[in-house]
């Protein structure tokens, strides 16, 4: 316990407790020093609890009882679970005080300037730096702009404020991916400009990077949520699921473009936009016509959606630069009038488009009704044609009715016979097919059950992976927190001596364990030997008793020998019982000696003497108070 006491004393001194240099153990603490140490620790742990407590023990007994009760209540409020009261401080025992001080030392923050339980990590450190910077800026006095020096003008003006304006960036992906062409990798390595060179304004760099990172993170989160909710239920691999989804999006885009092109063509509004839509649809058809069966339509559509030819992009930019008018301050009014007229034309065109759209919807409804009527008429005509065909055949058979009836009867009989044969064949095939169907149904059900089980296992595995990832993140944060706490620990205390002493204690414990194991094994061997000897003695006495008892009826000396044998056996039993009782008494003596040592460490006698002295002091104080009351 000496090392533990030294660590506790060092912790108490770091809290502000004035522990004398000659005190090296908790056993040497008196009541005044205990009260001061506890109050100092409470003030560091929770200033609101220790602010109302005095670290100096008052001389009066009633005040001492009050401060002892207050300290006990404060320790219980902190979560101390063991028994604590005013007697713990006024009539202290070494184990109780050591346990209480260890509890308070564990509650102490690692650094008095910061809370030890603050989160660690890059984000937490960044937040702390931001808070410190804001506090520093808020602590600066405010001055009018004309009275500020150059540094304050830069730090307290709005010249550093910029709008959050993000722009698209072209960044290189992972070059280790095999799906990236070598030409693109070469472009990334040699010709791709840096991020700061891609943007016209330098303040947009941070906004663009933050926006790109946020979009990537949100895309990953949306994909995980979609894969959890829909992807796993589709029983497809992630690549197949993405391919199916992109094919559906391609079809929807193509359908929307076709509808827009058809609407522009019906409204007779030729323009550059309609021409672009037509070219786009033609490109879709060309891409999907020849290579659709080869499975490359998706790649071509993806290239169309996410990539552009550099030459085409350059031509479009040149054409846009030629078409866009160069604004001038003198032509602002003319441009405003032109914009107003164009807006009116756009409104009128939109109104015409809405009217044409309504008429188109009406025509579509009319076409649907007419198509339904035409289908009904076609169906009625087919039914009447069938009736006419049957009647015509019957009229042709009327001239030779008897022969035709005989032939018809023959055909009916043959058909009946053939039907019977077919029924027999069908029954035989039906039984076989029914068995096959039941077998296939059973196999399908087993496969579905197996698939469901695999699906459930996949979901459980995915959840376990997510839980493991969260646990890894939490442990990483905990590791960073512990690392920051370790770095913030005071470096003046050398841990080498404590570590060496801990290793010595561990080696001593191992030696004691070996000795205890050896004693236990020796005890077991001794007990086993005692049991063997006891059994041998009992068996020997039984055999001897039987042999002597047979001859004791006939011979007087043998009868005396039998009596001596019985007395010897009884005396041996009493001797063994006496030895066992002696061992029990010795064990009880050792237990009592240990209890005496424990009570001696609790300083029971000194505490009782102190209690008697306090009792006399209280009686004296009461007598003085009564005397003052009578005098008053």
From Swiss-Prot:
Residues 243-269, 326-367, 400-540, 584-628 form a coiled coil. Keywords: Coiled coil, Cytoplasm, Cytoskeleton, Endosome, Protein transport, Transport, Ubl conjugation pathway. It is found in: Endosome; Cytoplasm, Cytoskeleton, Microtubule organizing center, Centrosome. Disulfide bonds: none annotated. GO terms for molecular function: cullin family protein binding. InterPro entries: CCDC22, CCDC22_CC, CCDC22_N. One of its GO terms (cellular component) is centrosome. One of its GO terms (biological process) is positive regulation of ubiquitin-dependent protein catabolic process. It comes from the Eukaryota. May be involved in regulation of NF-kappa-B signaling. May be involved in copper-dependent atp7a trafficking between the trans-Golgi network and vesicles in the cell periphery. Belongs to the CCDC22 family. PANTHER family: COILED-COIL DOMAIN-CONTAINING PROTEIN 22, JM1 PROTEIN. This is Coiled-coil domain-containing protein 22. The gene is ccdc22.
């Amino acid at each position: 316990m000496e090392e533990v006491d030294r660590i506790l004393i060092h912790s108490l001194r770091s809290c502000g407790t004035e522990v004398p240099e000659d005190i090296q153990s908790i056993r040497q603490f008196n009541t005044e020093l205990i009260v001061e140490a506890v109050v100092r620790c409470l003030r560091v742990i929770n200033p609101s609890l220790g602010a109302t407590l005095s670290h100096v023990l008052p001389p009066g007994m009633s005040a001492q009882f009050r401060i002892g009760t207050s300290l006990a209540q404060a320790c219980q409020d902190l979560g101390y679970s063991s028994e604590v009261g005013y007697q713990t401080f006024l009539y202290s025992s070494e184990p109780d005080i050591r346990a209480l001080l260890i509890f308070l030392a564990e509650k102490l923050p690692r650094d008095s300037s910061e809370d030890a339980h603050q989160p660690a990590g890059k984000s937490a450190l960044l937040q702390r730096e931001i808070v410190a910077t804001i506090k520093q800026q808020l602590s600066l006095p405010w001055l009018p702009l004309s009275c500020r020096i150059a540094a304050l003008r830069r730090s307290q003006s709005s010249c550093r404020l910029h709008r959050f304006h993000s722009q698209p960036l072209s960044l290189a992906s992972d070059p280790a991916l095999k799906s990236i062409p070598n030409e693109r990798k070469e472009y990334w390595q040699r010709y791709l400009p840096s991020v700061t060179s891609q943007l016209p304004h330098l303040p947009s760099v941070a906004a663009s990077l933050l926006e790109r990172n946020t979009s990537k993170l949100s895309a990953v989160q949306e994909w995980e949520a979609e894969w959890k909710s829909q992807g796993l239920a589709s029983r497809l691999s992630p690549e197949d699921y993405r391919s199916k989804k992109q094919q559906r999006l391609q079809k929807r885009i193509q359908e929307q473009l076709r509808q827009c092109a058809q609407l522009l063509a019906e409204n007779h509004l030729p323009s550059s936009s309609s021409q672009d839509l037509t070219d786009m649809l033609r490109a879709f058809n060309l891409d999907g016509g020849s290579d659709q069966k080869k499975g490359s339509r998706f790649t071509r559509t993806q290239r169309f959606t996410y990539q552009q030819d550099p030459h085409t992009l350059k031509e479009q930019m040149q054409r846009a630069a030629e078409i866009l008018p160069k604004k001038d301050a003198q032509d602002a009014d003319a441009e405003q009038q032109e914009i107003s007229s164009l807006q009116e034309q756009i409104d009128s065109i939109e109104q015409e488009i809405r009217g044409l759209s309504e008429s188109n919807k009406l025509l579509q409804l009319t076409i649907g009704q007419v198509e339904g009527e035409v289908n009904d008429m076609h169906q009625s005509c087919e039914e009447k044609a069938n009736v006419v065909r049957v009647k015509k055949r019957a009229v042709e058979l009327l001239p030779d009715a008897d022969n035709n009836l005989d032939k018809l009867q023959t055909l009916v009989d043959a058909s009946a016979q053939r039907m019977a044969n077919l029924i027999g064949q069908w029954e035989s095939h039906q039984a076989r097919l029914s068995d096959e169907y039941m077998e296939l149904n059973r196999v399908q059900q087993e496969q579905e059950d197996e698939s469901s089980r695999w699906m459930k296992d996949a979901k459980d595995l995915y959840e376990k992976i997510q839980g493991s990832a969260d646990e890894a993140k939490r442990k990483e944060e905990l590791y960073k927190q512990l690392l920051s706490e370790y770095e913030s620990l005071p470096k003046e205390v050398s841990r080498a001596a404590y570590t060496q002493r801990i290793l010595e204690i561990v080696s001593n414990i191992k030696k004691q364990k070996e000795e205890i194991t050896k004693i236990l094994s020796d005890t077991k061997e001794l007990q086993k030997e005692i049991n063997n000897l006891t059994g041998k003695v009992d068996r020997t006495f039984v055999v001897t008793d039987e042999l002597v008892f047979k001859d004791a009826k006939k011979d007087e000396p043998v009868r005396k020998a039998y009596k001596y044998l019985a007395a010897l056996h009884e005396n041996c039993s009493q001797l063994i019982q006496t030895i066992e009782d002696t061992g029990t008494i010795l064990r009880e003596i050792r237990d009592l000696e240990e209890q005496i040592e424990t009570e001696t460490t609790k300083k029971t006698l000194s505490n009782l003497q102190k209690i008697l002295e306090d009792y006399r002091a209280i009686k004296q104080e009461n007598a003085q108070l009564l005397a003052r009351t009578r005098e008053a």
